[in-house]
Amino acid sequence: MPDAAAAAAAAQDADAVMRDAPADAAAGGGDNDDDDGDDGTEEDEEEDDDEEGDEEELPPAEDPAAPEPVSALLPGSPNQLTLLFQGEVYVFESVTPEKVQAVLLLLGRSEMPPGLANMVLPNQRENRGYDDLLQRTDIPAKRVASLIRFREKRKERNFDKKIRYAVRKEVALRMQRRKGQFAGRANMEGESLSPGCELASQGSGQDFLSRESKCQNCGTSEKMTPAMRRGPAGPRTLCNACGLMWANKGTLRNCPKAKVESSVVATEQSNAAVSPSGIDNKELVVPNPENITASHGEVMGDSTPANEAEIGAPKAQSQ
């Protein structure tokens, strides 16, 4: 009996142990997880410390700055520009400080280098307003560049205008004038015959005026025609009608009154050209007697039929 009771008690203890084993295992697993979590946090902190140490030890890599171009004007040659860029030297001749200032303004710099300030001062005294405009920071670089281009173009344009004006002035001074106006070749040839002819032609102003105011073809006065026109003898030598026919057809019209008016003009000129002593030196214009007889013959011929008719009628009645 005691053995049976001991066996039953051992069986109950074994069952109790079997029931308590999962709970102990769960409790033990939680403790292990906590230990593992603590170990993980410690490892993370150590890794962060190592990374921070590495960052402190290795500074961040920076891009190497590009070398800026350096410009300088040599003291011995003020118009020579030297540029140093990436170890290479560039030398330019005949470069003024104004151009350097314009280039620096285009590159984004508003002031000249201190080494060039003293060299630009003499030019600033000559063109103070121009340099003040270039040194102003409130004006855009494009505006300054356009102003520089405009000034250069204006200088060239003014120079060309001065040259052309000087040449035209020399030509105008060499040309001959007549009554304040440029004389043409025809006038020059007519006036350059001989000084005696010029004095004779300019002796009487009335003859000159009367000759110019009459049409050379029909003798029409200047006051009797709308305008005097160009003819074969030159300008203002024909009346309006003769001038239009000459310009359109190239021929002069037939004027029956031209002979009569020409004789009248000749008599007027002979009366006007009287010597100071009161004696007329020109010959009188006498009509040709043949023309007179011919004209009378024509008149008689025209009148004969009428006379014959008048004479023949009474004879017929008498018979």
Swiss-Prot record:
Residues 1-74, 292-319 are annotated as: Disordered. Residues 143-185 form the CCT domain. Residues 74-109 form the Tify domain. Its main location: nucleus. Transmembrane segments: none annotated. GO terms for molecular function: sequence-specific DNA binding; zinc ion binding. Residues 1-15 have a biased composition (Low complexity). Signal peptide: none annotated. Residues 31-60 have a biased composition (Acidic residues). SUPFAM superfamilies: Glucocorticoid receptor-like (DNA-binding domain). It holds the Pfam family CCT. InterPro entries: CCT_domain, TIFY-like, Tify_dom, Znf_GATA, Znf_NHR/GATA. PROSITE patterns: CCT (PS51017), GATA_ZN_FINGER_1 (PS00344), GATA_ZN_FINGER_2 (PS50114), TIFY (PS51320). Transcriptional activator that specifically binds 5'-GATA-3' or 5'-GAT-3' motifs within gene promoters. Belongs to the type IV zinc-finger family. Class C subfamily. This is GATA transcription factor 18. It comes from Oryza sativa subsp. japonica (Rice). The gene is GATA18.
